[in-house]
A protein has these predicted regions:
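ABC ATPase "signature
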Residues: 241-242, 250, 512-513, 521
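Conserved ABC transporter NBD signature motif
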Residues: 68-80, 346-354, 366
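ABC ATPase C-loop
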Residues: 168, 173-174, 445
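Helix-to-loop junction immediately C-terminal to a conserved catalytic motif
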Residues: 60, 64, 338
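Conserved ABC ATPase signature
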Residues: 155-160, 164, 427-431, 435
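Conserved ABC ATPase "signature" region
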Residues: 80, 132-151, 405-422, 531-532
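Conserved catalytic motifs of ABC-family nucleotide-binding domains
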Residues: 177, 448
Length: 541
């Protein structure tokens, strides 16, 4: 690819941008300035609250609530968007500047077929016949990596996985061939191989059409692999700007150094916890020949084997990770172990007792020993409850102790997850994402479980917060002798925390073994493909 020349006129030029919300005179963006040239790929990297999304809202003139631009300019080919009318902005959004948003669930119409939603975006240009639109819909879906496009165009968003819904959003954004594509964490929820396909497609678009790309991400590896320049932000200010090699290999600012140090990579030194010496040897979990079949709605007699003859074990005091793409069956395995799904055949034993065959009192007892930590703490924590009520809810359900002893247990748990006891009377929306995940971990620990099932427990967190949560989990494992089954699509995280790894694809185990062995000498082509797709390894390896 030929990089844009340094003296090429900027397509987008942001100068001295300041944004405030409400009557608060303190800006949330402080004199932000940068350029994007035609065909250039620029990443903005930073934690939540750094101002990345506010920049997007400013460029598109879609700032939430009472946010408004109080200083600076945003020039698109010389036209100042900060002063453009709403009517003018409507002609620019989608046609000249398009957005791939982060959350497909809230950006697709649940009552409208997917193909029709892409067709709507195409029809907005007003220059195509229905036959041309129908043909282009299928082309866009195929380019975005959606198989069986003709059949799937007739389906609704809820019939797509999260990754597939994200591909639909990308197809919509690319439908009108914009000059500038703003991608807001477009692949953060996707598996590495799917991520690579999507990013390859975006790169092809840039090369073929000279489209500029503004990539918003917290993943330094993705930014390094896929962009020409990285802008590092913190607290509404630009901290550092440089090429990927400059930022990753020789960062100048302290904040950038912390970001680089916290970013997990496939080649990072393994930092798994050592279990307490008091932990007795042997497996806490044994899964043998597990099978789960689902009937496919609308296809008489058709069966989907979501889990197909899966066997593995988790030793006490260790971490086993299950990795795989969307649809690999890893979450279904976790749901069976948690007793949330029944198995078609096979067994899952916790300390020799059958989860799949247990009923009534025995199942309740097993559930005390196995607890989940989910991906989205905001979605899994009742927003009307105080933190104290959320953490002591399992104790109340299982009738453990009196009110005073439960309060003492909540205080002890807050100490264990490094939260101040003062948060007990606050509510989830008053906490950061990392703090909410600590509350979810405290809640999971309330009943003294032996095994935690962590389902994408850190995938929604920024790298600095992610590192803190992974360190906390490792410390708790050492202190309490906990065992973890870690469900994830992030192999770089697996390298950091897991003693053993199980690689799944389409319901089957492709490979399993010690993490070091699987990463350094993979025996499966699929594992090698997953490892080669991890972003950033070429620069930090």
């Amino acid at each position: 690819m030929s990089l844009p020349t340094a003296d090429a006129p900027a397509l987008l030029s942001v100068r001295g941008l300041e944004v405030t919300f409400g009557e608060n005179p303190e800006p949330v963006l402080h004199s932000v300035s940068f350029d994007i040239r035609p065909g250039e790929r620029v990443a903005i990297v930073g934690q939540s609250g750094s101002g990345k999304s506010t920049i997007i809202g400013s460029i598109l003139r879609l700032l939430p609530g009472d946010g408004h631009i109080t200083g600076g300019s945003i020039l698109l080919d010389g036209e100042d968007l900060s002063r453009a009318s709403e009517q003018r902005m409507r002609s620019i959004r989608g046609r000249r500047i398009a957005l791939v948003p982060q959350d497909p669930a809230s950006n697709l119409n649940p009552s409208m077929r997917v193909g029709a939603q892409i067709a709507d975006a195409l029809a907005a240009s007003g220059s195509r016949s229905k036959a041309e639109i129908d043909r282009r819909v299928l082309e866009l879906m195929t380019e975005a990596g959606i198989p069986e496009a003709e059949r799937r165009a007739k389906q609704y968003p809820h019939e797509f996985s999260g990754g597939m819904r994200q591909r639909v959003l990308i197809a919509i954004a690319l439908s009108r061939e914009p000059e500038l594509l703003i991608a807001d964490e477009p692949t953060s929820a996707l598996d590495v191989t799917v991520q690579r396909q999507i990013l390859n497609h975006l790169q092809t678009l840039v090369d073929a059409h000279g489209t500029s790309l503004l990539f918003i991400t917290h993943d330094l590896g993705v930014a390094a692999d896929r962009t020409d320049r990285i802008i590092v932000m913190s607290e509404g200010r630009i901290v550092e700007v440089g090429t990927p090699a400059e930022i990753l290999l020789s960062p100048q600012e302290e904040y950038t150094k912390r970001l680089v140090a916290a970013a997990p990579t496939a080649v990072a030194a393994v930092r798994v916890a050592s279990a307490s010496s008091a932990v007795k040897p042997g497996p806490i979990l044994e899964v043998s020949h597990l099978v789960k079949e689902f009937k496919i709605r609308g296809q008489r007699g058709s069966i989907l084997k979501a889990v197909d003859d899966v066997s593995f074990s988790v030793e006490r005091g260790t971490t086993t990770a299950i990795v795989g793409e969307s649809g690999s069956g890893k979450t279904t395995v976790a749901r069976i172990i948690l007793g949330l799904e029944s198995a078609t055949s096979g067994t899952a034993l916790v300390d020799g007792e059958g989860i799949t065959s247990s009923r009534g009192r025995q199942r309740r007892a097993l559930r005390r020993r196995v607890q989940p930590v989910f991906q989205d703490p905001y979605g899994s924590l009742d927003p009307t409850y105080s933190i104290e009520k959320l953490i002591d809810e399992p104790l109340r359900i299982f009738k453990v102790g009196d009110r005073r002893s439960r309060q003492e247990r909540v205080a002890e748990l807050l100490d264990q997850v490094a939260l101040p006891r003062t948060v007990a009377q606050r509510r989830p929306n008053e906490l950061s994402g990392g703090q909410r995940q600590r509350v979810a971990i405290a809640r999971a620990l309330a009943l003294h479980p032996e095994l935690l099932i962590c389902d994408e427990a850190v995938s929604a967190l920024d790298v600095l917060v992610q590192e803190q949560i992974l360190t906390l989990l490792a410390d708790l494992q050492t202190e309490l002798g906990l065992s973890y089954l870690f469900i994830t699509h992030d192999l770089a995280v697996v390298r950091q925390i897991a003693h053993n790894v199980v690689v799944m694809k389409r319901g089957r185990v492709m490979e399993q073994g010690a993490t070091n062995t699987v990463f350094e000498s993979p025996s499966s082509d699929y594992t090698r493909e997953l490892l080669s797709a991890i972003p950033g390894a070429s620069l930090v390896g």
